[in-house]
């Protein structure tokens, strides 16, 4: 079986040069329509290796590539994203469940229009998922990620720094809890901790561990869906804010609260729309957190069924620095004419021509001076921001 994902294209900036993409300093994502500046591909190969009755084994692999789309020949090292085996119905007492081990994209939750994965513990791991409890389905898993350095040891009176320090994440989810007609709840608890080698220790005041709590309500509505999400994280789980842990850091002690409402619906005949509203407050003890607001819509009008449509994406991001009290704001508009394989807003592949306009007001950035004691800390001014010395720009191009 072959599955995959790819995007590529060509674009220009109105003031000259190649297409530049727009992202608000401090925000964790950007509005992506007409605002992607790289060639990226995931090539998935899989095969059912064995089947007997309702029991089976499936091998799944995924290799990803990313280049800057500036030339014909662009070499890159592939990223080995997935290599796992999934066994279904192997445990008689848990019919319908799947036992798995290996590297895997594990039950990822995202907002498509801003390419934001708010619950994603993907990596090497193992687990048992979709255990039917009658009132819902239980999944348990353990995965791993790593950090550069992060721990050290004194060996033969010499300090040795670890090349990498691993973090383990333990995940429990209960999904499919029916709450109302067309609606269901999912709850999750993720515990992440740094796991050092023997004789190695973390830096004083390292966050060491943390938790991420997630509650998500999914509602079928208007020919599509709406998802309402509330998440709370502490300490090591506040760096990436997605479920991965960074327990060696001394800069992420604190907490995070996030609320998201997003979905895709049918407004009327020939009219579909994606939308998102997001609030995220990261409060760190070192006063270097942020408060991020985002709101956007992407309506689509079918011009010629089933292949041609017109899309308009309007998105706004605002990020307040905990340290400086200043705000970075940006709005972005994209108009695109699209030809796609079907009449849904999700239909792919799709080829489009687009024009994008962005306007921003950046008041703070991050100190990026190497070896500075303030490196990585927020500061007033536009140094260390994505403003490029201007306040607005337009781009145009074609992509799929």
UniProtKB/Swiss-Prot annotation:
GO biological-process terms attached to the record: monoatomic ion transport; polysaccharide transport
InterPro entries with a match to the protein in the record: G_neg_Bact_CarbUptk_Porin, Porin_LamB, Porin_LamB_sf
Reactions that this protein is recorded to catalyse: beta-maltose(in) = beta-maltose(out)
Organism domain of life: Bacteria
Keyword Transmembrane: yes
Swiss-Prot/TrEMBL induction comment: By maltose.
Subcellular locations according to the entry: Cell outer membrane
Chief localization: membrane
Parts of the chain that traverse the membrane: 1-9, 39-52, 55-67, 79-89, 97-104, 123-133, 136-147, 165-178, 183-195, 208-221, 224-236, 253-267, 270-285, 289-303, 307-322, 326-341, 349-363, 389-399
Gene Ontology, cellular component aspect: cell outer membrane; pore complex
S-S pairs: 21-37
Segments on the Periplasmic face: 53-54, 90-96, 134-135, 179-182, 222-223, 268-269, 304-306, 342-348, 400
Pfam families in UniProt: LamB (PF02264)
Stretches of the chain found on the membrane's Extracellular side: 10-38, 68-78, 105-122, 148-164, 196-207, 237-252, 286-288, 323-325, 364-388
Membrane topology category: Multi-pass membrane protein
Molecular-function annotations in GO: carbohydrate transmembrane transporter activity; porin activity
Site residues (Greasy slide, important in sugar transport), renumbered to this chain: 5, 40, 73, 225, 346
Keywords: Cell outer membrane, Disulfide bond, Ion transport, Membrane, Porin, Sugar transport, Transmembrane, Transmembrane beta strand, Transport
Coiled-coil boundaries: none
Family to which this protein belongs: Belongs to the porin LamB (TC 1.B.3) family.
Function: Involved in the transport of maltose and maltodextrins.
Complex formation: Homotrimer formed of three 18-stranded antiparallel beta-barrels, containing three independent channels.
Protein name: Maltoporin
Annotated source species: Yersinia enterocolitica
Gene name for this UniProt entry: lamB
């Amino acid at each position: 079986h072959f599955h995959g994902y790819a995007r590529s294209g060509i674009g220009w900036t109105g003031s000259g040069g190649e297409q530049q993409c727009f992202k608000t300093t401090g925000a964790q994502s950007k509005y992506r329509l007409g605002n992607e500046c790289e060639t990226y591909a995931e090539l998935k190969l899989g095969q059912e290796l064995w089947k007997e009755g309702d029991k089976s084994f499936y091998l799944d692999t995924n290799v990803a590539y990313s280049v800057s789309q500036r030339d014909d020949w662009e070499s890159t090292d592939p990223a080995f994203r997935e290599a796992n085996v999934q066994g279904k119905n192997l445990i008689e007492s848990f019919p319908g469940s799947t036992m798995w081990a290996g590297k895997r994209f594990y039950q990822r939750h995202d907002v498509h229009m801003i390419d934001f994965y708010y619950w994603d513990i993907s990596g090497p791991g193992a687990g048992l998922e979709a255990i039917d409890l009658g009132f819902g389905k239980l999944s348990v898993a353990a995965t791993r990620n790593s950090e550069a350095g992060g721990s050290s040891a004194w060996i033969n009176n010499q300090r040795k720094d670890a090349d990498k320090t691993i973090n383990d994440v333990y995940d429990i989810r209960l999904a499919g809890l029916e709450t109302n007609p067309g609606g269901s709840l999912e709850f999750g608890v993720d515990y992440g901790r740094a796991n050092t080698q023997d004789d190695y220790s973390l830096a004083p005041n390292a966050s060491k561990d943390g938790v991420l709590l997630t509650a998500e309500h999914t509602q079928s509505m208007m020919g599509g869906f709406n998802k309402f999400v509330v998440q709370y994280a502490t300490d090591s789980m506040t760096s990436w804010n997605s479920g991965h842990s960074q327990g060696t850091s001394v800069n992420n002690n604190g907490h995070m609260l996030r609320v998201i409402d997003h979905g895709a619906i049918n407004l009327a005949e020939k009219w579909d729309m994606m939308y998102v509203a997001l609030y995220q407050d990261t409060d760190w003890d070192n006063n270097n957190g942020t408060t991020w607001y985002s709101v956007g819509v992407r309506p689509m009008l079918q011009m010629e069924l089933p292949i041609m449509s017109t899309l308009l994406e309007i998105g706004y991001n605002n990020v307040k620095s905990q340290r400086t009290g200043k705000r970075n704001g940006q709005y972005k508009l994209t108009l695109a004419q699209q030809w796609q394989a079907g009449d849904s807003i999700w239909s792919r592949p799709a080829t489009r021509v687009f024009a994008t306009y962005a306007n921003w007001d950046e008041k703070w950035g991050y100190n990026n001076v190497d070896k500075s004691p303030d490196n990585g800390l927020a500061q007033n001014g536009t140094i260390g921001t994505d403003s490029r010395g201007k306040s607005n720009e337009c781009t145009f191009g074609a992509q799929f």
